[in-house]
């Protein structure tokens, strides 16, 4: 059975608590951790569009929040960016 949800993931904490040279990698990690927690799964697959959105304005200027569409199929969670 597929489970589908849309989340707005805040990344402001990553911006405030990270040095400028580590913001984008920590934002990707924060997105994964958020989805692991809320979808109750260990396997999270992120679409390339999420990665491009986070890295769009360089390493240190990440977006404040990201809207993500999440589909859970069995144990695997797949996330794509909401336009």
Swiss-Prot record:
<comment type="similarity">
    <text>Belongs to the eukaryotic ribosomal protein eL31 family.</text>
</comment>
<dbReference type="InterPro" id="IPR020052">
    <property type="entry name" value="Ribosomal_eL31_CS"/>
</dbReference>
<keyword id="KW-0687">Ribonucleoprotein</keyword>
<keyword id="KW-0689">Ribosomal protein</keyword>
<dbReference type="Pfam" id="PF01198">
    <property type="entry name" value="Ribosomal_L31e"/>
</dbReference>
<dbReference type="GO" id="GO:0022625">
    <property type="term" value="C:cytosolic large ribosomal subunit"/>
</dbReference>
<dbReference type="InterPro" id="IPR000054">
    <property type="entry name" value="Ribosomal_eL31"/>
</dbReference>
<dbReference type="InterPro" id="IPR023621">
    <property type="entry name" value="Ribosomal_eL31_dom_sf"/>
</dbReference>
<dbReference type="GO" id="GO:0002181">
    <property type="term" value="P:cytoplasmic translation"/>
</dbReference>
<dbReference type="GO" id="GO:0003735">
    <property type="term" value="F:structural constituent of ribosome"/>
</dbReference>
<protein>
    <recommendedName>
        <fullName>Large ribosomal subunit protein eL31</fullName>
    </recommendedName>
</protein>
């Amino acid at each position: 059975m597929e489970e589908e949800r849309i989340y707005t993931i805040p990344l402001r904490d990553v911006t405030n608590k990270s040095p400028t040279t580590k913001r984008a990698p920590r934002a990707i990690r924060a997105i994964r951790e958020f989805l692991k927690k809320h979808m109750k799964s260990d396997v999270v697959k992120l679409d390339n569009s999420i990665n491009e959105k986070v890295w769009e304005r360089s390493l240190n200027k990440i977006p404040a929040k990201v809207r993500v569409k999440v589909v859970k199929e069995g144990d695997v969670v797949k996330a794509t960016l909401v336009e």
